[in-house]
């Protein structure tokens, strides 16, 4: 497997750390006035999902993680597993709760997701950046209730709760940014 020098660290790079595949979230090269240069990184462990900060000397190198990112279509959830299909080979893969994690609330049938595999097993699921979901429960917006810039909580078909503007009603379909969990717009 390839090795990466700490000078090659970039956001999104997958490396092995303590026997577990990790993804670099951000890296900063620091060259102090006195002493050796180093790289300060924020890393997410792909299996456990833990965030950690680690400092590497400029001469350090680490092994690249043998992980594969695949674009797959989300099919359905049977209660224990979320099932995905490769559109080219029609091969199906099942991801458990540990792999889907927080992204389960953004999975919409027939949406293209990124499944990260390590040793042939799914370890993380990345939903599309934007999803369109229907509102199943929210407080009614009263006419003239526009004081303030706040919103109201709305429950979506997947169970996710998003803060929406006061004019949005039950039954409407909205567009949500899955990276931040924020309301983007109404869908016509």
UniProtKB/Swiss-Prot annotation:
It is found in: Cytoplasm. This is Elongation factor P. Pathway: Protein biosynthesis; polypeptide chain elongation. Involved in peptide bond synthesis. Alleviates ribosome stalling that occurs when 3 or more consecutive Pro residues or the sequence PPG is present in a protein, possibly by augmenting the peptidyl transferase activity of the ribosome. Modification of Lys-34 is required for alleviation. The modification N6-(3,6-diaminohexanoyl)-5-hydroxylysine is found at residue 34. It holds the Pfam family Elong-fact-P_C. One of its GO terms (biological process) is peptide biosynthetic process. The keyword Signal does not apply. Coiled coil: none annotated.
